[in-house]
């Protein structure tokens, strides 16, 4: 007997710096409601889905920087998203900037959560592979200061039971690293999902700009195929505060085939019928980890 569900990606168009959280949550609610009307069981939203991508600026005012972070989840503004999800019986994945205070010290993470169909948070992930730089670089048309505004995640790559599926998360740059996928594949993840804010221009290597979409989809397709898992990636896309962000949010099958792909640079919901048992098909007959892996030869991967 197959285990079927409808999976969705809720791509966001650009978020202006002046746009309020209330406005952004309203847009997310529209997509959540749209997805539920189409029979969706779970929807994936982007990285840092509640604000503009603030690491493109160099802030010297700590209070201004802190305004982009969430100190509780859900807070009063975001709570309607959870309540509506529970009313509609639909789960979701949401990315946001997390600020916690431990021992009087502020800690900042690029975070993602899994919420089940009852509106309960059942999983959390903090971005591990932080791209960009730590200090201001004058030559750039925009900054990419994730290494300044976040510390690397400290939760590993957990896999959670979310309603009927085993799910894991990545955030943006994580999708480019095979270790991200393999750890969750070894843990039995059936759906690996996450969000991204990917500029189409990379100032250090502009000769790669024409490959931005290719590398994004290559990472998603290879990760899904080599680990026998469904995957879903939700982008924040379009011209956001002078920076063009990549579209092509997608859903990928365990075979590596793209089964749904966005076609716009604005808020858009795409869906796919997902048979979770197809993961077993790949893991038994092609990537059978127990039968074929030789981990005694892989030590170098964890040493450097």
Swiss-Prot record:
Catalytic residue list: 47, 127, 172
Record field: catalytic activity: an N-carbamoyl-D-amino acid + H2O + 2 H(+) = a D-alpha-amino acid + NH4(+) + CO2
Stored Pfam families: CN_hydrolase
E.C. number: 3.5.1.77
Domain of life per record: Bacteria
CN hydrolase domain span: 5-276
GO molecular function: N-carbamoyl-D-amino acid hydrolase activity
UniProt KW keywords: Hydrolase
Top-rank EC class of the record's enzyme: hydrolase
Stored PROSITE patterns: CN_HYDROLASE (PS50263)
Keyword Hydrolase: yes
PANTHER family xref list: NITRILASE C965.09-RELATED
Subunit structure of this chain's protein: Homotetramer.
Function statement: The enzyme catalyzes the hydrolysis of N-carbamoyl-D-amino acids to the corresponding which are useful intermediates in the preparation of beta-lactam antibiotics. Industrial production of beta-lactam antibiotics is now being developed using this enzyme.
Protein name per its UniProtKB record: N-carbamoyl-D-amino acid hydrolase
Lineage: Bacteria, Pseudomonadati, Pseudomonadota, Alphaproteobacteria, Hyphomicrobiales
């Amino acid at each position: 007997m197959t285990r079927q569900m409808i999976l969705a990606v809720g791509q966001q168009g650009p978020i202006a710096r002046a746009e309020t959280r209330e406005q952004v949550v309203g847009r997310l609610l529209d997509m959540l409601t749209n997805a539920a009307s189409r029979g969706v069981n779970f929807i994936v939203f982007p990285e840092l889905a509640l604000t503009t991508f603030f690491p493109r600026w160099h802030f010297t005012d700590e209070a201004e920087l802190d305004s982009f972070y969430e100190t509780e989840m859900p807070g009063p503004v975001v709570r309607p998203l959870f309540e509506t999800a529970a009313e509609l019986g639909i789960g979701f994945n949401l990315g946001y900037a997390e600020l916690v205070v431990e021992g009087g010290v502020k800690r900042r993470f690029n975070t993602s959560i899994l919420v089940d169909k009852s509106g309960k948070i059942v999983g959390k992930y903090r971005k591990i592979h932080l791209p960009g730089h730590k200090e201001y670089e004058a030559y750039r048309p925009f900054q990419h200061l994730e290494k300044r505004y976040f510390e690397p995640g400290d939760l590993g790559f957990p896999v959670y039971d979310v309603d009927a599926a085993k799910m894991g998360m990545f955030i943006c740059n994580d999708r480019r690293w095979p270790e991200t996928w393999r750890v969750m594949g070894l843990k039995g993840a059936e759906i690996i999902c996450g969000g991204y804010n990917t500029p189409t221009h990379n100032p250090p290597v502009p000769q790669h700009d024409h490959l931005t979409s290719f590398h994004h989809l290559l990472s998603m397709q290879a990760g899904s195929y080599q680990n026998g898992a469904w995957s879903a990636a939700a982008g924040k896309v379009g011209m956001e505060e002078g920076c063009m962000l990549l579209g092509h949010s997608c859903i990928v099958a365990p075979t590596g085939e793209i089964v749904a792909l966005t076609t716009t640079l604005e808020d858009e919901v795409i869906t796919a019928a997902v048979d979770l048992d197809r993961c077993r098909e790949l893991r038994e007959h092609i990537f059978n980890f127990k039968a074929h892996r030789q981990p005694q030869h892989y030590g170098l991967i964890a040493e450097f």
